[in-house]
Amino acid sequence: MRRVLAAVGLITMAGAGQAAGGHLERVLAAREIRVCIWPDYYGISYRNPKTQQLEGIDIDMARALARDLNVAVRFVDSSFAQLIGDVTQDRCDIAMFAIGITPQRSEKLHFTRPHLVSDIYAITTKSNRRIRTWDDIDKPGVVVAVAKGTLHEPIMRDKLRQATLLVTDTTQGREQEVESGRADVFMTDFPFSRRMLETTDWARLVAPAATYHLTPYAYAMQQGDSPWHERVEQFLADATRDGQLMAAIRRHKLDPIAAPTSASKN
């Protein structure tokens, strides 16, 4: 875990290139912060289909950031496939939906300190007899689905040796492939695996027996805007120190994947 977080520091520093800046000034002048979210991210930035209300840790933290800035918040629907374009083309001031810090994304985006760290998990069906344990996944004839643009796509492309990788255009597509039996498993993370177990009657979790691939999650913004990045980092430092961040993590049952830096040292 410490090695992962140490590597994050190098990646985020490398992401601080030159680009258009001035988001802090714009936010304060407009009295509004535009926050990109992925509204299907259970426990993170989820639009509840029953209420149509947004809920999750990063919804709570986005609203807290807006209060800290004394501005309104406007949520902008995005996705992992759209993430880089939405941020770099200024459709939002910041993306707040537990974004995995990867080398590919860090070439284009500037990340904050991580607040969550998740391993990779697999979802299969309760009726699938081929997949019983994690060791059954990378075998000849097994089809592993991942969603385009997610961090799981490059990771599984690199790690799989015998199984067939199926990349779907949407996250719903990977679920449909598994539920229909066309794929054996789809790869996801801790928050989304909870959604599958709590909201479907067919999903079964397959967890790695040991650490497989930890990824730190953070918020992302344009490169080259140091005042904005520093202001958000100050908010996160304050939210960590006063316990607000950890309270939000626990409220949404994400404490198993809380980053060590999310807990107050007081």
Model regions and ranges:
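Extracytoplasmic small-molecule ligand-binding "clamshell" domains
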Residues: 20-98, 107, 251
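Ligand-binding clefts/hinges and TM-proximal coupling segments of bilobed small-molecule sensing domains
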Residues: 22, 151-166, 206-207, 237-266
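Short loop->beta-strand "edge-of-pocket" segments that line small-molecule binding or catalytic clefts
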Residues: 30-37, 55, 135-149, 164-165
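Ligand-binding cleft/hinge of the Venus flytrap
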Residues: 45-51, 62-71, 134-138, 149-170, ...
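Short helix-initiation/N-cap motifs at beta->coil->alpha
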Residues: 59-60, 74-85, 132, 166-180, ...
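A ligand-binding cleft/hinge motif common to bilobed small-molecule-binding domains
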Residues: 81-85, 98-107, 155-158, 179-213
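Flexible hinge/capping segments at coil-to-helix
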Residues: 113, 125-142
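Periplasmic-binding protein-like
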Residues: 116-124, 190, 194-237, 255-266
